[in-house]
Amino acid sequence: MAEKKEFVVGIDLGTTNSVIAWMKPDGTVEVIPNAEGSRITPSVVAFTKSGEILVGEPAKRQMILNPERTIKSIKRKMGTDYKVRIDDKEYTPQEISAFILKKLKKDAEAYLGGEIKKAVITCPAYFNDAQRQATKEAGIIAGLEVLRIINEPTAAALAYGLDKAGKEQKVLVYDLGGGTFDVSILEIGDGVIEVIATAGNNHLGGDDFDQRLIDWMAEEFKKQHGIDLREDRQALQRLRDAAEKAKIELSTKMETDVSLPFIAVSPSGQPLHLEMRITRSLFESLTRDLVEMTRGPIEQALNDAKLSPQDIDEIILVGGMTRVPMVQRFIKEFFGKEPNKSVNPDEAVAIGAAIQAAILAGTEGAKGRDIVLVDVTPLTLGIEVKGGLFEPIIPRNTKIPVRKSKIFTTVEDGQTEVEIRVYQGERPIARENIFLGSFKLVGIPPAPRGVPQIEVTFDIDSDGIVHVSAKDLGSGKEQSMVVTGRHKLSEEDIKRMIEDAKRYEEQDKRLKEEIELKNRADDLAYSVEKTLREHGDKIPADLKSKLENMIKELRDAINRNDIPRVKMLFDDLQKESMKIGEYLYKSATGGEATNQ
């Protein structure tokens, strides 16, 4: 029996819809239709009362009858502790996402007549490491070897063939999907695609446009009949479907009719029907502010990249919402040029993922095509050090994959373990940043403080997942962790943290200087105390007693956080401790020290 042929695919695992594609031997990319014949699969999973699991269009179709057992937009929960409870079983977001991936895989295998074992899966540029790890886990649960997790805007740029343009260019990707808005600026040239800035709003998308239509129709119906359809889940589901359909039709038509017979029953028992005409101008007046909400993230991305709208060579569209004429007009007015509409915006990300999958797998169609994808870290990564300071190890906007190390030491004599506390953020004080996790390195041989050498390494792989390790260079003992932090950072979180760092710059600087002063004072007290302990017999008793008192006073001031007194006592102890050296030299030379 002949072995089944193996295929590698690219998958756009979307909030609202998902798409799967592959690269043919001739180098063209085909979007693979599902069992229902559609190239787009709704990211919806349903559990019927009989125990059947429905995915995609069949799940979406029965949402009206089974709203409590139907899950949509699970992508929003990736990387969190959220669980879906159906009957007596709980499902993680990864497991729900895996049902979607399994359907895509199964339908594509039936279409291609072979096996799919390897895939590239996409995620938003601003997914943090926990969300990326969850995406990878969903792929593994679905029976896929995930070759790479790549950023959606990067995939879109590949789909538009911009890596083959033969010139350096700045490209802006405007991605307005079902649940999220992302804007990314890429630098493309010589086969390298680099993400140089990203921004967005992870609570703005097609769902919000639908909601405006739902609310308008519900309010009109309420005015006519005194019944709020939004209070009946089945009626609301029918409204939602009608709103989505109307929105799609209004991208090509100037008006559309909505007809929902038997949507409700009057208090007297009469069946009520919803019949309405919606014009494009009405739709635009209801949603104009939503389109306007995309302006801020565009300006932020341009600002971060230090570019003006005129510096952008190409604007590419991703997400079905970019078909809306008002969205396209807004983009044209903002940039003064037409966006590139050469690729189906619903399919661009999956097409790009398929291209990258083919390159990584070395398939026939990808021969001669080599691309380096360069992503960046959204926030600085580092650890907490003495006094609660944040010590950066990988700065914000560092290109990944990356590996960086720093050497640290102990703060107490005889210390046999250290806790490595990992943070992400831009503030110099650790507690003001996002805590990602911690682990302990134990078994450090006892030694005076400052002697052990502990190498802390941060390693961010090509999927953006962070690995942290600590190694005692003396004993070779090592401990590590993969950062799967519970904190889901949205674009707004990232923006807020960067703005906070600017806003509190003066306050943070003062606090950092105070902590550094206390650390230096503590180090000096320790050093002088150690010298007195080791060489006390060579130092006059009155000086020794004076220094011991000064050390005690300095430590008291540190503990009381009396900064002016710490500064004064630190300076005094520094000057007074100089005398130790004189006596040690006298002792060593047997007399007066002479100037050279």
From Swiss-Prot:
CDD domains xrefs: ASKHA_NBD_HSP70_DnaK-like
Gene3D superfamilies from the UniProt entry: 1.20.1270.10, 3.30.30.30, 3.30.420.40, Actin, Chain A, domain 4, Substrate Binding Domain Of DNAk, Chain A, domain 1
Modified residues (Phosphothreonine): 180
Coiled coil ranges: none
Keyword tags: ATP-binding, Chaperone, Nucleotide-binding, Phosphoprotein, Stress response
Similarity comment: family membership: Belongs to the heat shock protein 70 family.
Its biological purpose: Acts as a chaperone.
Protein name: Chaperone protein DnaK
